[in-house]
Amino acid sequence: MANLEKIVEDLSALTVLEAAELAKMLEEKWGVSAAAPVAVAAAGGAAPAAAAEEKTEFDVVLTEAGAKKIEVIKLVREVVPALGLKEAKDLVEGAPKTVKEAVSKADAEELKKKFEAAGAKVELK
């Protein structure tokens, strides 16, 4: 314990330049870098914000069928060929429902325009 107290006293007596030189010498001796954890933490904090700003995939959600329900049902069947007439009708009548998931921004915008032209209300999430 006495050795540790002596080390603390010796380190406290160093000037800023001497402390910086000591840090460099320890980095070389131990093969580490004191700056790496700081850089990783800064990059890690910025990544989620960038991901939130640049969303590339969207879900097309039918929020309301509107007055032209038959046209909207036909469009749902066109967009999702796996759905039969009954499933498409149930989807439209059960709005809000997700019509397509993980669609590119351009495709999502195109689908939104088609649904709005058919009288439906659509959200991109």
Curated annotation (Swiss-Prot):
Pfam families membership: Ribosomal_L12, Ribosomal_L12_N
Domain of life: Bacteria
Record's keyword annotation contains Ribonucleoprotein: yes
InterPro entries in the cross-refs: Ribosomal_bL12, Ribosomal_bL12_C, Ribosomal_bL12_C/ClpS-like, Ribosomal_bL12_oligo, Ribosomal_bL12_oligo_N_sf
One cellular-component annotation, GO: ribonucleoprotein complex
Keywords (A to Z) from UniProt: Ribonucleoprotein, Ribosomal protein
The keyword Magnesium belongs to this UniProt entry's keyword annotation: no
Any GO MF annotation of the entry: mRNA binding
Cystine bridges: none
Database matches in CDD domains: Ribosomal_L7_L12
GO biological process: translation
Gene3D superfamilies noted in UniProt: 3.30.1390.10, Single helix bin
UniProt-listed HAMAP family: Ribosomal_bL12 (MF_00368)
Subunit structure: Homodimer. Part of the ribosomal stalk of the 50S ribosomal subunit. Forms a multimeric L10(L12)X complex, where L10 forms an elongated spine to which 2 to 4 L12 dimers bind in a sequential fashion. Binds GTP-bound translation factors.
Family listed: Belongs to the bacterial ribosomal protein bL12 family.
Function in brief: Forms part of the ribosomal stalk which helps the ribosome interact with GTP-bound translation factors. Is thus essential for accurate translation.
Protein name as annotated: Large ribosomal subunit protein bL12
Organism: Hyphomonas neptunium (strain ATCC 15444)
